[in-house]
Amino acid sequence: MASSGTTSTRKRFTGAEFIVHFLEQQGIKIVTGIPGGSILPVYDALSQSTQIRHILARHEQGAGFIAQGMARTDGKPAVCMACSGPGATNLVTAIADARLDSIPLICITGQVPASMIGTDAFQEVDTYGISIPITKHNYLVRHIEELPQVMSDAFRIAQSGRPGPVWIDIPKDVQTAVFEIETQPAMAEKAAAPAFSEESIRDAAAMINAAKRPVLYLGGGVINAPARVRELAEKAQLPTTMTLMALGMLPKAHPLSLGMLGMHGVRSTNYILQEADLLIVLGARFDDRAIGKTEQFCPNAKIIHVDIDRAELGKIKQPHVAIQADVDDVLAQLIPLVEAQPRAEWHQLVADLQREFPCPIPKACDPLSHYGLINAVAACVDDNAIITTDVGQHQMWTAQAYPLNRPRQWLTSGGLGTMGFGLPAAIGAALANPDRKVLCFSGDGSLMMNIQEMATASENQLDVKIILMNNEALGLVHQQQSLFYEQGVFAATYPGKINFMQIAAGFGLETCDLNNEADPQASLQEIINRPGPALIHVRIDAEEKVYPMVPPGAANTEMVGE
């Protein structure tokens, strides 16, 4: 950690006071969580802060996803808190989700007093052990003197290299202990990105210049390099595909955009990739939902792979040029060496394949249908709106149809695929971006996972609009069972009808059932324009499918569906 910016005024703190002081110094404005006995000293200190606002979630998992919503929209570490035992275990899913999607979080939990660890004390669990596989790094602070370095290191680690969550478990007696510090840690900064060789850049440029059928393949790791990604694509005329996590890096209507690849991607894109002779892979990890059967993915293509995480290079596909580095740093040196080329023949083949394998959007103009609803919602807002989703069919329909045109516009659970992500993430996005509308597309199964966070949205009067596609089923489970399992659909439908309108109203949300409106588009526009949280309800046929679909374990060219 850099030593510049330190002060030498001796100060006296309890552990809890120091934690809050450090968060203030770090520029944290919002913390979300739920208090409990083992973290009450921190909450006592937090109550005295004039700089930090606390958002009381209704479930610790909700707190974790609220923090994710903040971190995903501004790229900076966000903070969530919980007590020991069930508070900590309730956070696990949200933290694991952040790990797989590379989201910088600081998770602070209370723990039983250090002398009682290992005695099965009330609300004691091995938080440190549980969090090892789901965090970028974790700490159990046994002595108050460790706190300054741990807090500083945690923020540095969370945002350096490949971002991720850091978990700090702090026994109650460490929070109440008193110490004096003379030199306070400087504000934690990102560590420098790895250096890379000029030779690797020259090799990559030569491969791009020589390629006849190159494709640019973007993953979530390009999130901080939108301008240079676009510059590279346009200069070299590279058809560009994006993973679920990279949607918006090129505007949907950009002439070079191929849209999403993979299991529910654009049909023509999966075929175009098979024709490629070069893949320029930036910040992507070749996950199975994107590439299908590994050995049949782009069999004739050489690969340039740039990623900040060394572990991703060669993990799934062996690259011909591998560069461990920050994507933006690499592109700054690569773009001047790349030749401007029209690549007319390649673009003609791409256009031919797009005509041969069109991407129809059924019922695109009907706001009471799945795709039509998404289009109708998009027509009500501009590109400043933030879009979150839960996980399921509605997520894939939204990924396919919504006009995502900028980075950090699209928040979705990619790697872990967590139902219940959408609403609390939308709350976090609204907290971090109070001047923007936040739209949460959800399904009835997903919404019920964290429906209690409606109270959080209402209490804080956040401009979050929940667009609920209610098919009274677990849609993707229903789809896979009906397509691929001989016994058909089992345990994937909800036999009892739930009145989501009454539930939302009970939490204090405005409501609108589009199925009961004479002019659904006008009613949709009216409620979206209205400030504050709202639920917009539409019934969807449980037999609707997300197509195309690559069957599990199949190659991307073995898509089924319309």
Curated annotation (Swiss-Prot):
Pathway: Amino-acid biosynthesis; L-isoleucine biosynthesis; L-isoleucine from 2-oxobutanoate: step 1/4; Amino-acid biosynthesis; L-valine biosynthesis; L-valine from pyruvate: step 1/4. Its cofactor is Mg(2+); thiamine diphosphate. Residues 393-473 are annotated as: Thiamine pyrophosphate binding. Its EC number is 2.2.1.6. GO terms for cellular component: acetolactate synthase complex. Keywords: Amino-acid biosynthesis, Branched-chain amino acid biosynthesis, FAD, Flavoprotein, Magnesium, Metal-binding, Thiamine pyrophosphate, Transferase. Mg(2+) binds at residues 444, 471. One of its GO terms (biological process) is L-valine biosynthetic process. One of its GO terms (molecular function) is flavin adenine dinucleotide binding. CDD domains: TPP_AHAS, TPP_PYR_POX_like. SUPFAM superfamilies: DHS-like NAD/FAD-binding domain (SSF52467), Thiamin diphosphate-binding fold (THDP-binding) (SSF52518). Thiamine diphosphate binds at residue 60. The keyword Repeat does not apply. NCBIfam families: acolac_lg (TIGR00118), PRK08155.1 (NF006016). Dimer of large and small chains. Belongs to the TPP enzyme family. E.coli contains genes for 3 AHAS isozymes: ilvBN, ilvGM and ilvIH. Contains 1 molecule of FAD per monomer. The role of this cofactor is not clear considering that the reaction does not involve redox chemistry. This is Acetolactate synthase isozyme 1 large subunit.
